[in-house]
Amino acid sequence: MDRQNEQTTGRLWFREHVNKSSSEVLELKKIISEEKNIIAKINQCIEKASDDLLKLVGASDGLQTSQRRLRNIRHFSNTLFNIMRGGIFDNHYDIEKLDFSDYIKRSNKKVFSKKKDLINNLPEIFDIKKLRFLCENDDDKNFIRLCYEYLPLKFSRRHGDPSRPWNKFNIKVNDGDSVLYYHEGNWRDIFQNWEGLVISYPKSLPSIISKFLNATTKDGYNPYRINKEGIDWEVVDEDDTWSHIGYWNDHQIIYLLKLLEGQWQIDRSFILDSLNKKIFSTANVPYKIRDDEEILKDPKNTIDFDHALHQKIMNDVKKIGTDARLVLDQDQVVHVSMAEKLLVLQLSKLSNFIPDGGIWLNTQRPEWNDANNALVGYGVSMVTLYYLNRHISFINKVLAGVNETEFEISNEVLAWFRETKETYKKYSPSVNERLDATKRKTFVQELQKLFSNYRMKTYNKSSSGGDKIKVIEIINFNNLVLAHFENSINNNYLESLYSAYNTINIDNSNKINVTSLYSMLEGQVSVLSSGKVEPKNAVKVLNALFKSDMYQKEQNSFMLYPRKGLKRFLEKNIIPEEIVNESNLFKALLKRNNTDIIYKDSSGKYRFNDSLINSNYLKAELDKLSKTEELKQIMIDEKSEILRHYMTVFDHQNYTGRSGTMYGYEGIGSIYWHMVSKLLLATQELYFKAIQMNEDTDTLRNLGNLYYKIRSGLSSDKTPEQYGAFPYDPYSHTPYKRGAQQPGMTGQVKEEIITRMGELGCVINNGELIFNPKLLKISEFLTESSTFSYVDVNQSMCKLDLNQNQLAFTYCQVPIVYELSDAGQSISVSYAKNKIENINGDSLSKEMSENLFSRSGKIKEIKVCFERSHFLF
C-alpha cells in the first residue's frame, strides 16, 4: 500500500494492490514516483473501472429508472452481488475457441484427442447456438455432455465467509490481459445465483440444468463444490476438528425445480427430448452411506469417507482428466438418461420419508439454516417435503406431455423404484389419517432397507444393464406419493401455521414417535411455495404470521423463529426427586456414594454426572455398572428407564443447535434477510397463481398488500437508522436489537432480482414473454422527465429520454419502456433496422420472444402502454 497527497485538492490517495511480485511492486513504485500526471491517470483508471462495472451490471439487466430511486439502486446492488457470486457471460452467449478447447482437454484427454480437429476448425469466436448444433450432430456422448454443460462465465467469486475455518476457496478474476473464464462455488450457493442470472440469459438454462444433473451421485445427493472443471468434495482430515462431510437435502430439490420450471416456460423441448437420452453422468463422490441398520442405530453418524477411492480418483484425474471424478466403467464415463437422474433424486428423498414428520435428516448435514445443525440425525424436515410436493407435481405435468410410453433406466434403479412403489402402496393412508407409531416404524424400516440394498449393489460398480420403465408407472407412483404427502402436510398445520421441522424418537423400541418443534419462518416460506396452499388460504397463513411471535415490530419483519428465553445454567440438569425415589439404581448409587452417574449437590438437587455429555457416555457407564454383581439385576430392570430419564432431563433430541442457544448469526431473535426475501417471492408466486385462477379482486388486493407489507420490512424501504446500514446494500442478517450484519455476498440477492422482475410483470409462458405488471405500484412511474442510462446488446452505454408517466428497465439488454396511457394496452416493438411493429395485447410472439432470449440484436426497444385501471396498487 502507498499513499500520496494531491496538492491541488488536499486529498490523500491510497493505492492498494494484491497478488503482485517483488518486481511488479518495484515497477509500480517507480511509476508513482516518476509519473508527473499520476493523479490524472488514477482518475482515468477509476473512470474506466466504473464504466466496466456498469457494463457488467447492465449486461445482467441491473439498470432501471423509476420514481423509486432507492429501489433502482438496490436492484443495481442485488444484480452486482449476484454476478459476483455466480459469474456472468462475457459477451452474450459467445464462446472463445481457446477456452473451450482448454476446457475439453482438462475434462477428458481422450475426448480432446478424438475431437481435436473438429475443435480446431471452429471459428475463434462462436456462440451457444453453434455449440448446441455440435451436440445435436455428434454421436460421442462424452463430447455431447461436455458441450451441454460448458459455461463460459467470468467475474465469479466463490461465496464463503473466510472467518469460518472450514471455508477454503479461490478467487480467480483475471488472467493477465485476457478474460478469465472461471466459476467456483458451494453447490448450495452457486445454483441459486444462476437462477437469478438466467432471467437475463435464458438460453443458458440447458447448460446449467445439465451441470446440475451431471454432478449428482448414484445415491441421489450432490457434491459440496462446483467449479468450471467439474466437482469437488470435502475430504476428511483426522487431525482437523473442523473436518466434516455430509449431504444437504432441500437445496437440491428446490434449486433444480426452479431451473426446470424456467426451462419449461421458455422451451419445453430440451426437457422432453432429454428424458430418454443417455447423455448424463454421475458424480463419484467417495462418501459411502452406511446400511439401514447402522443408520437406525446411530442416525447422526451415517457416512464413511472412502480414502482409497478418493486417492484412486485423484490419480485418475492426472491420467484421464476431471471426468475421472465421475462414475466410470473401464475408464469410460457411464451415461444415463435425464429420466433416471430425476428418478434417483426423487427416490433418495422418498426413501427417507417419515409419515407425519417429513424427510429424515440422516446424511450428517442440516438444511438451508446451518444453525439447525443439531437436528441432524433425529430431525425430520417438512421443508423438503413441501418442496418435494411441488417438484413431484411438476414432474407429473412434464410426463403428461411426453410422446414416449417408456424410458430406459438401470436395472438397479428400476428394482428400487418398483419395491419402493409397493411399500408406499402397502401403507396407503386414509384421508387425514395420522399413522400409528408402530406402523410408521415398519414403513420407515422397509424404505430404509430398500434404499440400503440399492446402495450396497451400486457402490463401487457400474450398472448391470438397462431396463424399461413405463411413463404411466411413474405418474401413478407420484400420485400415490402426493396422497401420502397431503396427509403429512395437513397433520403439520398447527395453530394457523405450518411446521418446518419435527423430531423423532427411534431408540430401542418398535415405534417412531414424531414430536413437533416450534414454528419457524422457513416452514411458512416452503409450504407457501409447495403448491398445496391456495391463494385464499395463503392470505390466512400470512396474516397469522404477522400476528405470530416471529414478527418483530421494530424491524417490521420476521425472525427465523420466535424469540425464547434460555434456562440459566443452574436450572439445567436437574433430576426430579420423585424419579430418584422410584429408581433402585439411583438409590443404590447414592447410598454407595458412587457419583459416576448421579450425585446430590449442595442445594439438595439431584444431577447427572457432568461428564455424561450425551447418551453414549451414559450407556458406557451403565455398561460398566452392569458388570458389577450386586447391580446386574437392577441394570437389567432399569437401564432403558435411566436412559429415558436422561433424555427427558436434557431433551437432546429436540435441541436444534446454534439456532436455540446463540443470539447472533442465525440464532435467537435473528432476522435472516434471505429467508424474508424467500417469503416475498413465495407471496408473489401466489399472487400470480391467483391471477391464473381468476381469483376475485379482493384476494388479489389482500395478497398484494401482504406482499408490499413484507417488502416494506426489507432494506430498500428503510432509512439507514432503521436498517443499521446502507439500505441499498444487501446484508445477511440482523441480530435482535442491532443493525444489519455481514454485507454483500448473500443469497438474498437472487430472490430480490426475481421479485423485481415479477413486480414489473415480466412473465414467460410457453416461450412467449408477457407484460402484466398487475403487482407494480403506480407510484413507480416518473412524475417528471428523466434519462435512462443502460447498456445495449452491443455493449455500448446508451441514454434514453423518458417522460412523465414512464419508467424503464432492460430485459436481455433490450430497453423496455412502460407508459401510462388512456388508449388501452398495446406493445410497440422497434427493430434495429428502424422497423416498428405494433401489437394489441400483452404478449410478444414466440419469434419476438426468441429474439430477446437469444440476444440477437434484432430488437432495439420495446414500449408497452397501460391504462391506469390496470394497476391495483
Question: How should each PLM-predicted stretch be described?
Answer:
Residues 1-873:
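Acidic, mature catalytic/reactive cores of soluble proteins
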